């Protein structure tokens, strides 16, 4: 199976002047790529656009921090869906060592407003620790499905699942956490974190997530599930994107966002890489649709 290859132009977003850009969420609309991301120097969520997924326009802030709320001294780690004529954003608000998930809306996809004063998801269980963060939301047959990370504020520990009929009032799964680290896998022996999930016709629900070898070393991994909640199978090819020694992502590869490009027959994946305190956005591709062929071969005894 073809491997994921880092683009030679990396990083594709972020610089000393722009500052740290991280935890991206990429979608495609009207033939263009839309990247929602966290802009650390601005303590805000921002958006940028591209025709090829490599060269990006000047970012625009979509939602700023709101210290007056008591839970949004800093905001980041968002995802945005367009449903009908409304852009819907779920994002992470942080204050006093805690993280929460908030909600905002927009009619133009740039200027978002908060219809609510309170977060839509908070930490309630011991395993959720101090934080719920990194929302990834899909809308299927009238149901909003959210995968989120929970645990410590600096880096979360597990992944969980919730559902909603309106995107605001959420019911957490009774089997949470739905995805945890397996200590025998060195690449995730410390914890797992921020993910993106998509539904496919041929592989079920596919998840790309962060596996932490330790609190400072992270890499990108993948898994699949028939229902997005249970029977997760982690790829024997993990990790699929690793730090490159001596490079801009030498210490960690975080929070993937990925999509299938039917026209070019390839997977496209964006992530934020770190070297020391700098975090910028990188781009990788994989030719061909196959992601889990090696798993299928093993299960068939081949």
Give residue ranges: language-model regions:
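Carbohydrate-active catalytic/glycan-binding domains of CAZyme proteins
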Residues: 1-302
């Amino acid at each position: 199976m073809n491997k994921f290859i880092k683009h030679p132009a990396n990083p594709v977003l972020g610089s000393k002047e722009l500052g740290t850009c991280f935890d991206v969420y990429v979608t495609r609309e009207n033939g263009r790529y839309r990247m929602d991301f966290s802009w650390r120097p601005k303590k805000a969520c921002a958006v940028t656009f591209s025709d090829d997924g490599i060269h990006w326009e000047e970012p625009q802030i979509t939602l700023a921090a709101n210290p007056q709320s008591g839970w949004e001294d800093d905001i980041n780690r968002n995802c945005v869906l367009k449903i009908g004529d409304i852009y819907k954003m779920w994002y992470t608000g942080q204050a006093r060592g805690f993280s929460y998930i908030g909600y905002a809306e927009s009619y133009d996809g740039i200027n978002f407003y908060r219809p609510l004063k309170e977060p839509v998801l908070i930490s309630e269980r011991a395993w959720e620790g101090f934080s719920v963060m990194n929302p990834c939301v899909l809308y299927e047959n009238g149901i909003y499905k959210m995968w989120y990370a929970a645990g410590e504020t600096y880096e979360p520990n597990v992944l969980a699942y919730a559902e909603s009929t309106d995107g605001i009032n959420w019911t957490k799964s009774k089997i949470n956490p739905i995805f945890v680290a397996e200590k025998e896998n060195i690449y995730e022996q410390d914890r797992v974190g921020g993910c993106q999930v998509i539904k496919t016709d041929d592989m079920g629900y596919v998840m790309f997530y962060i596996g932490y070898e330790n609190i400072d070393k992270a890499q990108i991994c993948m898994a699949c599930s028939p229902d997005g909640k249970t029977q997760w199978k982690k790829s024997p090819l993990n990790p699929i994107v690793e730090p490159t020694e001596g490079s801009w992502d030498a210490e960690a590869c975080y929070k993937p966002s990925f999509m299938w490009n039917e026209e070019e027959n390839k997977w496209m994946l964006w992530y934020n890489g770190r070297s020391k305190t700098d975090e910028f956005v990188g781009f990788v591709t994989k030719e061909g649709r196959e992601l889990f062929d090696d798993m299928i071969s093993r299960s068939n005894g081949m």
